Amino acid sequence: MQTNRFEHPLNEKVRIYLRLEYLIRQMTHASQLSDQWQHQIFFRALFDLLEILDQVQLKTELAKDLEKQRCKLKNWLNIDGVDQNALLELLDSMDMAHHKLIAANRLGQDLRDDRFLSGIKQRFSIPGGSCCFDLPTLHHWLHLPLAHKQNDLSTWLSQLTEMTDALNLWLRFTRESGPFQPQIARAGFFQHTAEDASLLRLQICPSYGVYPMISGHRGRFAIRFIPFEEGATIADTIEFKLAIC
């Protein structure tokens, strides 16, 4: 059965992690295409990402969070029923990602120092500011041979590798820490406790014609399902699956 999946952070740090993951996915997808309009999406996502990195001390916080996860995983060693080989492999991956993150320069600094990127970044903050008369440099680049552009895009993405690897590991472990459980919302409303949780994951069948509005924090959260179509009625009961991570 097809389901729509939603995620909701329960603290500001996880909110930032999810936004970074979202932007990196946009960049990765756009970098693999030949369409110049997709390449402009790459730049917009990249500059949004750099804005976030300028506002938060991500490197320190992400390194701390990865180390906390590593300590939790170590407690599973020698526990019956745990795949020790898979666990050791994951611990090795975390050790490597943590080491590379700590050893890395300021996150995104090479991208900030790039002459071409720094020359076009400011115009992307203006609505419609990437037109050819605003950014002739960009439009020259957009018409370079595809191999040249893909090499540039790959280079820029690679300068975020340490952050991306650490972030992906942390989010993977966090998502896998909470299994999906069936739940029922009555009159479109559901609430529950979430002690020490950092992320909610929700699956719902699109045939209900609703989307979730989620509010909450580490201690408690509420979900209200809203009809997508104006004036539509909502089912008395809505079955969905929820993971508290």
UniProtKB/Swiss-Prot annotation:
The alphabetized list of GO BP terms reads:
division septum assembly; FtsZ-dependent cytokinesis
Q: Which GO terms describe its cellular component?
A: cell division site; cytoplasm
Location in the cell reads: Cytoplasm
UniProt keywords (A-Z) are:
Cell cycle, Cell division, Cytoplasm, Septation
So what family is this one in? Belongs to the ZapD family.
Q: How is the quaternary structure described?
A: Interacts with FtsZ.
What does the protein in this record do? Cell division factor that enhances FtsZ-ring assembly. Directly interacts with FtsZ and promotes bundling of FtsZ protofilaments, with a reduction in FtsZ GTPase activity.
Q: What is this protein called?
A: Cell division protein ZapD
Q: Which species is this record about?
A: Photobacterium profundum (strain SS9)
